[in-house]
C-alpha cells in the first residue's frame, strides 16, 4: 500500500484543515520495572517451565499505525478509525 508523505487533513487542535506529515508509529522501548515484567521474571526464575501457554501462531500481516503531525501547531494525532492491516507499506511523494 502506498501512502503520501504529506496530506491535507483536519487538525482537531487547530480546528481547521492543514497540511500534515504522515509518520509510522515506532515501537517504544519496553520498561523492565513494570509490575507485569517483575512478576514474569519472578515466576520464570529457577527451575520449572513457562508459566503460561505459548502462542500458537502469529498473524500473517501486522497492523500499521499512522500518526499525523500538523505543520502549523506541531501536535500529533492518530486516525479516527484506528490502524489497519497491510502486507507491504511505503510512503510516496505526491
UniProtKB/Swiss-Prot annotation:
GO terms for biological process: translation. GO terms for molecular function: large ribosomal subunit rRNA binding; structural constituent of ribosome; zinc ion binding. Binds 1 zinc ion per subunit. Keywords: Metal-binding, Ribonucleoprotein, Ribosomal protein, RNA-binding, rRNA-binding, Zinc, Zinc-finger. InterPro entries: Ribosomal_eL44, Ribosomal_LSU_eL42, Ribosomal_zn-bd. Its cofactor is Zn(2+). A zinc finger (C4-type) spans 11-73. Zn(2+) binds at residues 11, 14, 70, 73. PROSITE patterns: RIBOSOMAL_L44E (PS01172). GO terms for cellular component: cytosolic large ribosomal subunit. SUPFAM superfamilies: Zn-binding ribosomal proteins. It comes from the Archaea. Binds to the 23S rRNA. Part of the 50S ribosomal subunit. NCBIfam families: PRK05767.1 (NF004425). HAMAP family: Ribosomal_L44e. Belongs to the eukaryotic ribosomal protein eL42 family. This is Large ribosomal subunit protein eL42. It comes from Methanocaldococcus jannaschii (strain ATCC 43067 / DSM 2661 / JAL-1 / JCM 10045 / NBRC 100440). The lineage of its organism: Archaea, Methanobacteriati, Methanobacteriota, Methanomada group, Methanococci. The gene is rpl44e.
